[in-house]
UniProtKB/Swiss-Prot annotation:
This is Reaction center protein L chain. InterPro entries: Photo_II_D1/D2_sf, Photo_RC_L, Photo_RC_L/M, Photo_RC_L/M_CS. (7R,8Z)-bacteriochlorophyll b binds at H159, H179. The gene is pufL. The lineage of its organism: Bacteria, Pseudomonadati, Pseudomonadota, Gammaproteobacteria, Chromatiales. The reaction center is a membrane-bound complex that mediates the initial photochemical event in the electron transfer process of photosynthesis. It is a multi-pass membrane protein. One of its GO terms (biological process) is photosynthetic electron transport in photosystem II.
Length: 278
């Protein structure tokens, strides 16, 4: 892939966290770095272990290469927080380590790229929230509940079954107040950024013979429709806040389900019915 005209001046030494100049190079447009190598290693090992797990299966009947049916299940609850045999959940434990290694390596690679460019660490900071949500699901919550078996299985359909089953364990998971906040932030984020994206497209794609519109048109549109324009920079701050809030409350909603609340979530709202106001 050809290098863009402005890229060469940014391909400078330094900014690395580990390894010095050893891995300080690019492969095509991709910066490698120590964490690029580490991330590739963990990702490749994890994928190969999933393929191996699909090959051996927990039993002969469940050996499959159907991508929809492949499932690497966590250990049985009886193993607690100990290591399980490879075919009884140990594979899931090792793949989890690989996933964590790959995700963290990717984030640290982003840090190195930011250091090279002299820009802020907003991108790795945002990605860290996604990593944190994953850690809550496969590390924090299982530890709080006393068994790795409370983690979710690695499989397309099997992990959807896990989500459904956990929801039914708490009757109506949508009554979880943190889940409500997470969904609210998800939808609000979609609304805000879709409105922003459509506005930019509308002013930068004029009809034939017309000029490209300016930020004055953008601000005027939103002042006309909702009475306020947040501005070009602030809409991105708002989008980041909404996205990170959605991820944060998603992690909260699952980590409190089980370790801190064991009954159906509709019961949590009894305090509302017992208010003296009624």
């Amino acid at each position: 892939m050809a290098m863009l005209s402005f890229e060469r001046k940014y391909r400078v030494r330094g900014g690395t966290l580990i390894g010095g100049d050893l891995f300080d190079f690019w492969v095509g447009p991709f910066y490698v770095g120590f964490f690029g190598v580490a991330g590739f290693f963990f990702a490749l090992l994890g994928v190969l272990l999933i393929v191996w797990g699909a090959t051996i299966g927990p039993n002969a009947e469940l050996q499959t290469y159907n991508i929809w049916q492949i499932s690497i299940a966590p250990p049985d609850l009886s193993y607690g927080l100990g290591m399980a045999p490879m075919t009884e959940g140990g594979l899931w434990q090792i793949i989890t380590i690989c996933a964590i290694g790959a995700f963290v390596s990717w984030a640290l690679r982003e840090v190195e790229i930011c250091r090279k460019l002299g820009i802020g660490f907003h991108i790795p900071f945002a990605f860290a929230f996604a990593i944190g949500a994953y850690l809550v699901l496969v590390v924090v919550r299982p530890i709080l509940m006393g068994a790795w078996g409370h983690g979710f299985p690695y499989g397309i359909l099997s992990h959807l079954d896990w989500v459904s089953n956990v929801g039914y364990q708490f009757l109506h998971f949508h009554y979880n107040p943190a889940h409500m906040l997470a969904i609210t932030f998800f939808f609000t984020n979609c609304l805000a950024l879709s409105m922003h994206g459509s506005l930019i497209l509308s002013v930068t794609n004029p009809q034939k013979g017309e000029e490209v519109k300016t930020s004055e048109h953008e601000n005027t549109f939103f002042r006309d429709i909702v009475g306020y324009s947040i501005g070009a920079l602030a809409i991105h701050r708002l989008g980041l806040f909404l996205a990170l809030s959605a991820v944060f409350w998603s992690a909260v909603c699952i980590v409190i389900s089980g370790p801190f609340w064991t009954r159906g979530w509709p019961e949590w709202w009894n305090w509302w019915l017992e208010l003296p106001l009624w």
